[in-house]
């Protein structure tokens, strides 16, 4: 689950991080009032969406009057912002953050943290190349990224934070200020189950003080059950409607841009299914893992999700029967197809527990369901059907 910038800043401020001042506005009048309250020579109006690349997409504007703040806010709120991180429809802008005047600054730094799967620990990344996408820095000048891995038994040590400060070229009081900031960030990361933390840029102001000009936080969705206050911050308007509906039925769904809908049990098998569809010249329309408890109701909902995407021209069902029997899955598929009147080609591959019985149920159903002998055969059949 992602947080908006204003939510991220509020959370980080509660852990003692120095954040750029800002006021949330839901309309032009509120934006104008926010500009007056901040009282600087200028302000920055930022569209609040769950996507990066806002600046290049016109979602971040510098304004030098209350009238301009109102005008920019009204031009953004109620629209969809399309960035390189969104699909063609973009993300809805429901509010803007009017931020205080902080520039010019001495320099811009970068500080971020993720859970490193290779070390299975929280790893901080810092760079002198702030204000630039960290992926670009990693690709072009990786030597400018400094990494610190935190031992979960002892937590982030002051010496580690100071070492990063030295690497960033900070001096005197800035070193302790940065150490406090980084320690607060680690505490926030652990206590709130962050999956991602990023401050870019971390500005060094003309007076030498540090300030978080932007804030990006991603929460591990698996931990939301123990984070009730964080869960309240969820903005469902920023999520894909089908993905949101899928979560209500415990279906793991990710919308893609192809023509072949996929229904699979198991994330690994689902990825392999998408790979072989691509290999055979097709394009998957989604990732959909129905999980181990694939009941009739879940299969029906899975079909509905897939077919709500009007670009879907065919469906490939790939089920490996383990605990869940293939005959039970076949019965659920037949019932689902009858209930929702599926009118696109459907290819079914069943393997494992009671696979032969499952195939028999499909073949005797009288429905236009095509059985496949193996994944390779299934992919070839669905690609051929869609391209016919």
Curated annotation (Swiss-Prot):
It catalyses: succinate + ATP + CoA = succinyl-CoA + ADP + phosphate; GTP + succinate + CoA = succinyl-CoA + GDP + phosphate. GO terms for cellular component: cytosol; succinate-CoA ligase complex. Pfam families: ATP-grasp_2 (PF08442), Ligase_CoA (PF00549). Its EC number is 6.2.1.5. Mg(2+) binds at residues 200, 214. The keyword Cytoplasm does not apply. Keywords: ATP-binding, Ligase, Magnesium, Metal-binding, Nucleotide-binding, Tricarboxylic acid cycle. Succinyl-CoA synthetase functions in the citric acid cycle (TCA), coupling the hydrolysis of succinyl-CoA to the synthesis of either ATP or GTP and thus represents the only step of substrate-level phosphorylation in the TCA. The beta subunit provides nucleotide specificity of the enzyme and binds the substrate succinate, while the binding sites for coenzyme A and phosphate are found in the alpha subunit. NCBIfam families: PRK00696.1, sucCoAbeta. This is Succinate--CoA ligase [ADP-forming] subunit beta. Heterotetramer of two alpha and two beta subunits. Residues 9-245 form the ATP-grasp domain. ATP binds at residues 46, 53-55, 100, 103, 108. It comes from Neisseria gonorrhoeae (strain ATCC 700825 / FA 1090). Its cofactor is Mg(2+). Belongs to the succinate/malate CoA ligase beta subunit family.
């Amino acid at each position: 689950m992602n947080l908006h910038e204003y939510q991220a800043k509020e959370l980080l401020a509660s852990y003692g991080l120095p954040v750029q001042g800002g006021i949330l506005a839901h309309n032009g009048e509120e934006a104008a009032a926010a500009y007056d309250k901040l009282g600087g020579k200028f302000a920055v109006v930022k569209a609040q969406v769950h996507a990066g690349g806002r600046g290049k997409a016109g979602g971040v504007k510098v304004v030098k009057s209350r009238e301009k703040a109102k005008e920019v806010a009204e031009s953004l709120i109620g629209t969809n912002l399309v960035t390189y991180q969104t699909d063609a429809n973009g993300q809805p802008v429901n509010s803007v953050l009017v931020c205080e005047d902080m520039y010019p600054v001495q320099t811009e730094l970068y500080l971020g943290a993720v859970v490193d799967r290779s070390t299975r620990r929280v790893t901080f990344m810092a760079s002198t190349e702030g204000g630039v996408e960290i992926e670009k820095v990693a690709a072009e000048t990786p030597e400018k990224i400094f990494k610190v891995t935190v031992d979960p038994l002892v937590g982030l040590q002051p010496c580690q934070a100071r070492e990063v400060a030295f690497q960033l070229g900070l001096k005197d009081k800035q070193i302790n200020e940065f150490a406090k900031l980084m320690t607060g960030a680690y505490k926030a990361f652990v206590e709130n189950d962050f999956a991602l933390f990023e401050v870019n840029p971390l500005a060094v102001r003309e007076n030498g003080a540090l300030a978080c000009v932007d804030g990006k936080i991603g929460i591990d969705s698996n931990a939301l059950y123990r984070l009730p206050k964080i869960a309240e911050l969820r903005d469902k308007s920023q999520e894909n409607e089908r993905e949101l509906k899928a979560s209500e039925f415990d279906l793991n769904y990710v919308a893609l841009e192809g023509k072949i809908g996929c229904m699979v049990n198991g994330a690994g098998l689902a990825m392999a299914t998408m790979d072989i569809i691509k290999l055979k010249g097709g394009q998957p329309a989604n990732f959909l893992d129905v999980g181990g408890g694939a009941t009739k109701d879940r299969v029906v909902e899975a079909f509905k999700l897939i077919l709500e995407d009007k670009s879907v021209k065919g469906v490939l069902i790939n089920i490996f029967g383990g605990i869940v029997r293939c005959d039970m899955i076949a019965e659920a598929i037949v019932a689902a197809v009858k209930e929702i009147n599926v009118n696109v080609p459907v290819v079914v591959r069943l393997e494992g527990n009671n696979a032969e019985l499952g195939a028999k149920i499909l073949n005797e159903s009288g429905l236009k369901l095509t059985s496949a002998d193996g994944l390779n055969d299934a992919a070839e059949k669905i690609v051929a059907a869609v391209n016919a």
